[in-house]
Amino acid sequence: MRQLADPVRKMGLFNLFGKKDVSEIVNNSPFKLSTVWIPYTLYANRNGSCTLSVKLKNVTEEPLLTSIVVELPQSLGFDKTGMTKQREVRIGEMGAGEEKEVGVEVFGGLKSDSGEYTVMLTAIAHYRDYGHVINAVKKRTSLKVV
């Protein structure tokens, strides 16, 4: 399996002219991802919100078209009604070594009981447009509801 994968990458499967080596992006993690909740807790069974601050750094030598997907559990939402559970933030092209910070507001409501909720983050490196994916980095973070 390893012998077949290397020649395909060297052919530049993702490049229009077939000359670009993308093995570094495919094999290694292209991003450094860190998160902070502001404030760090949310109140149970009350309408309220907090902001998920996401810092994303491109650690490759090339610019990457980047987006972040945030997925919430059932009792939280991205709007006051709590209906939206997934959001994609299109960051655009990040240069080599560039760092960007994105804030996403998360709402709790009357159905959010106390406990710890897991939020999934996925940072995606795209090629050409947002429909083609080269690599992705996933991270879980938890929000405490008291």
PLM features per residue range, with description:
Residues 11-45, 146:
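Low-complexity, acidic Ser/Thr/Pro/Gly-rich terminal tails and inter-domain linkers that flank the onset
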Residues 46-61:
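Short beta-strand elements of extracellular/lumenal beta-sandwich folds
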Residues 50-52, 100, 117-119:
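Hydrophobic core residues within well-ordered beta-strands of beta-rich domains
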Residues 61-78:
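Short acidic, flexible loop segments centered on an aromatic residue
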Residues 75-90:
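Short beta-strand and strand-turn-strand segments in soluble, beta-rich domains
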Residues 90-100:
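Short proline/glycine- and polar residue-rich coil/turn motifs
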Residues 101-106:
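Exposed aromatic-hydrophobic patches
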Residues 108-146:
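Terminal connector regions
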